[in-house]
């Protein structure tokens, strides 16, 4: 698809965050496809393995990486816990924690989106935020014109262990294929993710 080809051509030659940020405007990607910074403001903090271990020592997190009983926690913690509970997201926190404390090599097969989000929260270079739209755009790019593969990736809506290889390929691409000048910027993968999120979302709606 031409829009995907143009997107990756621009990403591969970008040397600054500003150049990456201009791509969506240059390609005239509609605002409705773009990540809303008011809904998803940039996370400027990181969470380390050591911080998770400290929470375990304090009894906030169990040895199984689940949230413990927080009845005696501070009001903010209880409020955020309540939001996760109401949305049915308590088990998702386990996957995020596992992503934060894991090493580079792993065999994780479920909860991949939240697991990778945990890796992103460590703010280690080349650890992106993964979602269906980003992988859709990258998958179409990797299909290299193969219509059958393109059609399959355009329909991608749920990320399972079948997409683990594609996730690994995307992470390798982020760490090795982009210009060194771009990779020298802190949190560069976040800005690349935003571009691919919008492009992937646009080709899904148009498919």
Annotate each PLM feature.
Residues 65-75, 89, 113, 145, ...:
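Intrinsic-disorder/low-complexity, polar/charged segments
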């Amino acid at each position: 698809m031409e829009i995907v080809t143009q997107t990756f051509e621009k990403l591969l030659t970008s040397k600054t965050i500003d150049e990456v940020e201009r791509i969506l405007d240059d390609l005239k990607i509609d605002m409705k496809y773009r990540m809303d910074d008011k809904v998803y403001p940039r996370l400027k903090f990181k969470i380390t393995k050591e911080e998770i271990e400290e929470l375990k020592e304090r009894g906030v997190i169990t040895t199984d990486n689940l949230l413990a009983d927080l009845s005696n926690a501070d009001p903010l913690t209880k409020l955020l816990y309540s939001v996760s509970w109401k949305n049915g997201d308590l088990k998702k926190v386990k996957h995020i924690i596992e992503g934060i404390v894991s090493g580079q090599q792993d065999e994780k097969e479920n909860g991949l989106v939240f697991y990778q989000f945990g890796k992103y929260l460590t703010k280690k270079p080349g650890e992106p935020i993964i979602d269906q739209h980003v992988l859709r755009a990258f998958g179409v790019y990797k299909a290299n014109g193969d219509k059958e593969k393109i059609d399959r990736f355009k329909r991608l809506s749920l990320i399972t262990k079948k997409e683990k290889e594609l996730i690994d390929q995307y992470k390798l691409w982020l760490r090795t294929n982009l210009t060194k000048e771009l990779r020298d910027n802190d949190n560069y993968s976040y800005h690349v993710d935003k571009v691919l999120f919008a492009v992937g979302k646009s080709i899904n709606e148009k498919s």
